[in-house]
Amino acid sequence: MGFTSILNDKLIGFYRSSYVENGVTKYLATSDMEPADARVAFPCFDEPEMKARFSIILGRKESWKSSSNMPKIGTNPIEGMPGYVWDFFDTTPVMSTYLVAMMVSEFVSTPSDPALSNVEFRVLTRPELQKDATYAANVGPRILEYFETFFGVAYPLAKEDLAAIPDFGPGAMENWGHINFRESYLIVNENTTASSKQRVVEVIAHELAHMWFGDLVTMEWWNNIWLNEGFARYLQYFGADSVEPSYKLHEQFVVNTLQRVLVSDSLDSTHPMSYPEEKSQVFDTIEYDKGASVIRMCANFLGMDTFRRGLNRYLTRNAYSNAVEEDLWNTLEEQAAIDGVILPDSLAKIMAPWTQTTNYPLITVKRTYIEGDGALVTQSRFVLPSGEGNSVQEDTVWWVPLTYSHDFSLHPTTAWMSTATRTLVSLAATSDQWVIFNVNQAGFYRVAYDEANYNMIADQLIASHGHISIPNRAQLLDDAFVLAKINKISYNIAMDLTLYLKYEREYVPWRSVLDELDYLDVMLHNEPQYVDWKIYMTSLVTPYYNHVGFQESESDAHLTILSRTDALNWACKLKIDDCVQNVKSQYAALMEQPDMRLSPNQRDFILRAGVENGRRAEWDFAYEQYKASDSDSFLIAMTYTRESSIVYDLLGKMLDPNSIRSEDVDKVFTNLAANPLGNAMALDFLVQRWNDIEDALGTSHFVTFFRSLCDRLNKQTQYEQMVKLRDDHFDILGNSTTVEQGLGVIQTNIEWMSANQLEIGEWLKDPSTATALPTTEATTEALTTTALPTTEATTEALTTTSTEHTSTLTSSTPSTTTTTSATPAPTTPSSGVIIQPYLSLAFLSAVLGQWVFRQ
């Protein structure tokens, strides 16, 4: 079939990109076919299950280069076109159309050391970035080798190219043998921050994992895209960890992936991982992060050895073909049976509620504190309240892999909670011992406890927080603050759990709770309670800040650098003097020598904090640097001023394109709206100068301006003012979902203040004190390096006791101690089962009488 097409500029199909080199615009042709844009490039049956072999021939100038999925096998002159040649590429294996890659450019290649991999590995960049391709060329082949060993399946192609594209829509695209990246997701140099370098290695690992999950075995249709993206997200932590073990990425999974999607999947607007109907082009946090979290949970209860062998079976059986989720569950279940892992039901039935319905369970644990201590464990769907009604299926119940422990030097107890809403659990703990469920937060659910258990946990954290694993410390904080925020537990409980933070030195627990603490800081900022809040937060942050210090050292561990970023932001927010003085000194030196190099990890912070703690001279310097360099860093820093006259001037400059570029006005206004001083002034500016704004900027910015103001507003008068603003300009702001969402945020803030402001204020007057004494810091920090053995899957006996969906549950509690470091998922489970005595009706009555949770 003959056809003719053109290179488009829409970043889809086979398209034209460009960049500037030495003042000259250079062009290249590249591709992005996912999900359904191969049809834009060439005639085809553009569906993932309609796989084919592709023989690609690309024409180019002799001085240019071309690349595709497969190695080049020949070059011939183009007849009648002197100076042009055809490049012939080897035929691909059978693959989906969306994986086809084509590129013609003046790029240069940086080859990897052949000793790192049996596969030819190159990084393709524009010439000026070649020196910055070394990191990718070093870690890429090592990650590929790791995955070959991990899966037990060889990479089937002869080469792998990683190409840095100047204009690229997604972050990266897993074309088989020719992965395309945004430049910032592949390039590492002396100006790359620690967090950006981590992102680079994770994205490389993510895309290389796709060479098996997505490319070798492809989902049958887009409604199962999580089979591609969930696995790639989960496995990126393994691949990246194999080359950067000091990043402790398996710990970071909890805060970077799991806890984030726990929020997304608790909204009314969420959707299942698998759609019953055909829905293409769904690439969001559910497919990626919930998919990864559910896969991680499955690996945990199967055991990592069984899980890996099952993946080998899945990849081998479905190679060069397509799969649906049942294919995955069936092969994993087959492997579980071979390995002696007995499941309480078919794996497909166990996993169906997790993949085919929305939300997840809240596990509520209520202990009896009587001899033969036990607990009533209930499950209920966790959905954040909204004013738009609830459309979820209330009858969903989950098979829940429960894990719990009272001593993190022992293997945790493991048990299955059946598809019942209540289960009686026999605990090994005595009444004066805490119990923590969801060990290492391996399960995709939240946990709430009775008040007595919370108090014992809080005491343990203060006495020696290292006796509780790092992921569980993060889980306790995250779950408690989310539950308190929606009035499931008292804020006193959540705040009690923060008391130990003055001893916490690990990045992950702090990162887990800082966003929630920031919300409290915003809500209380203009309230009488803010003085006590600031005193309390200073008592927590100061030791953390002193531990990491202001100055960066070449010997700093990766997580120390990330911790310092958080500690500095809070230290200067709280006006801790050492931080403020260091900022002023560094900013003054920068004003004296504008080309002075600042650490990339601290540069943006110093610019922002320098303006925040400065006066007019510091702001004027930032403004002049913005004008001279078009720097977003200086632009954002300008919005941090605490001088009202400067805020007023900056708002006025937004209306003059010679002062603030038109494309930057949204950044200026939204960041001013996040400024405690700027929020009120920005709102007044919007109300008073609406017509001037419309004349200067048009109407396209108003919805963004309106929404950005809402997050800090928490008074009924403010809500009424915003409603009036919407109604006065209904032709622009009316019928906007974004505007209504903003008004909903204000209502939520008002309700939160009504429910919690006074309670938190009372707590802050005299923060409760746990009776246990902290260990010495040296002991505490040593304990944090002792990790909990990961959960082992066991066979559980489940006996139905009534028609009210209550069951008794027995569990296996191996008592072997271990001091080995925690692994991402467990080894093959033991077969021992300990049958516990039946729990009596007296037990049930005692549990039901202890209800700390708000109805």
Where are these regions (language model features)?
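Long, ordered, helix-rich scaffold segments
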Residues: 258-259, 263, 371-372, 378, ...
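Glycine/proline-rich low-complexity spacer/linker segments in large multi-domain proteins
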Residues: 3-55, 105, 110-113, 442-462, ...
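Long, intrinsically disordered low-complexity tandem-repeat segments
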Residues: 773-800
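Hydrophobic helix-coil surface modules that form long, contiguous segments used
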Residues: 31-36, 43-205, 234, 427-429, ...
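C-terminal GPI-anchoring signal of eukaryotic secretory precursors
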Residues: 809-839
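Hydrophobic alpha-helical and helix-loop surface patches within well-folded domains
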Residues: 89, 120-388, 519, 526-539, ...
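Cleavable C-terminal sorting propeptides in eukaryotic secreted/cell-surface proteins
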Residues: 830-855
